[in-house]
């Protein structure tokens, strides 16, 4: 991941970081037959990503949201979004069904409201 981030973000200036978002989606979790990552695994990878971003950009890296994608659905969204290093969700197939997407959004909003209060 570190190498991918360093190569992918080479040339990005610190003053442009407010427009940069990173989404992590394990290849084995993509698609209809994808296996969702556990919340613990996703959290560990997000910590690694944030560490790499800090190595590249220093304290300015805190401006970069890191999202998780990869078979996100209403059944696992809440366990992912409560993780401290996951800043948001990158939703694919679950957004195809309006009811599922609505449930997912409501669950995420509930978690964010609990963080703020």
Task: Give each language-model segment a name.
Residues 59-62, 84-86:
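Short, surface-exposed connector motifs at secondary-structure boundaries
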Residues 67-76:
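Glycine-rich phosphate-binding loops at beta-strand->alpha-helix junctions
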Residues 25, 80, 92:
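Conserved, mostly hydrophobic/aromatic
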Residues 23, 67, 90:
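Conserved beta-strand segments that form the floor/walls of ligand-binding pockets within enzyme
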Residues 28, 34, 71, 85-104:
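Glycine-rich phosphate-binding active-site loops on the catalytic face of alpha/beta enzymes
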Residues 42, 83, 95-117:
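C-terminal helical cap(s) of enzyme catalytic domains, especially alpha/beta-barrels
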């Amino acid at each position: 991941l570190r190498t991918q981030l360093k190569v992918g973000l080479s040339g990005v200036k610190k003053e442009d970081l407010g427009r940069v978002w990173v989404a992590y989606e394990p290849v084995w979790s993509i698609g209809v037959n994808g296996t969702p990552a556990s919340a613990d695994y996703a959290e560990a990878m997000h910590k690694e990503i944030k560490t790499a971003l800090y190595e590249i950009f220093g304290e300015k890296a805190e401006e970069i949201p890191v999202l998780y994608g990869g078979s996100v659905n209403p059944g696992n969204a809440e366990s992912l979004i409560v993780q401290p290093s996951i800043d948001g969700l990158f939703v694919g197939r679950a957004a195809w069904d309006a009811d599922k997407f609505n449930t997912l959004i409501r669950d995420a909003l509930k978690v964010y409201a609990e963080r703020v209060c």
